[in-house]
Amino acid sequence: AGIVVQAYLPDAYEFQTELLDFAKARMADGGAPLKMRLVKGCNLEMETVISSLRGWPNPVRTSKTEVDANYLHILERALLPENAKALHVGVASHNLFTIAYAYLLSRKLGSAEYMTFEMLEGMADHVWRAQSQLGNHVILYAPVVKDEHFLNAVSYLVRRMDENTAPDNFLTHSFNLKPGTDTWRFLQNQFEEAYKMKDVITHIPTRTQNRLHRYTPVPPADVMKNEPDTDFDLAQNQEWVRNIFAKWKKSPADSPEIIPLQIGAETVVCEKRHKYMDRCQDDEVCVCEMSQADAGQVMKILEIAEKDPAGWRKTTLQERHKIMYEAANRLGEMRGDLIGCMLSLIPI
């Protein structure tokens, strides 16, 4: 077992840094070493779909060469003896060039005892058999699924079939592969390009959303575009939501917010009010009191809606478009308070 680091993420190097720091501190405290499984990345389609649905940038690198370069960059640091002792390395790859590089580098650095090769059962079996004959420690793994989750196995199979038949994938070209052929030279050039790039590859993540920053209003546009969801994987957004908790968590000594009733352009605080209690505090703290309309006020609201004194019915489509954008931007500015209000009133 090990903690996976996926090289197709630009910030994978930073994840490795966190693991190294934790593993070294753990060993210094008398604990056992950890293990990092280094993979290229296996959820590209899912990452792409989720990013599209949530309005986020795609988090993965844009080319296979960049992914391979990042893999080699992380691998080199992982195999340094002072790192490999604390954080053992599982080199998960079916690429002969990557495997050979890891094999030679680990022996050059003297860290081979802390490294294993990992391969999927049933894929490139001749490669792991050859490695075993060389005395390498090879771990074979296979997905396991219960009968009731068989659809997950089907989706996994389809994903692997798609991945392993991609034009740039090593396994696509691995059958009857021989040194000196055009296919061999193509794969060799792939590896050499990645090797040249490994020391200049950047580690800047594509997702930099920061809800702590002031909201930037969105100008009107002809095409509707949803506001991106909050990415709670990001540390700054986690801090933002903790601040919301702190702001909206009332104590019994705090006075509740008084919510007025709106009648047309006027607001009225009614004598009759409904109390909303904080569900997260066992309904012991009142968050707000909502004004409740009487029969006369309800009739006045209906009259205003019927007569339309503000002239809403006469506004043009362009005017409504502008107003709706202003309302959307205002909601964006108040996002934190809206979430805080919901957290206070809705049990979680």
Question: Where are the language model's segments positioned?
Answer:
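Positively charged, amphipathic and often flexible ligand-engagement surfaces
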Residues: A1-D222
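Terminal low-complexity tails and localization/encapsulation signals of metabolic enzymes
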Residues: D147-E303, K307-A310, K314-N329, E333, ...
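Conserved helicase NTPase catalytic core signature
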Residues: L343
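Conserved small/polar residues in nucleotide/adenosyl-binding loops
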Residues: P347-I348
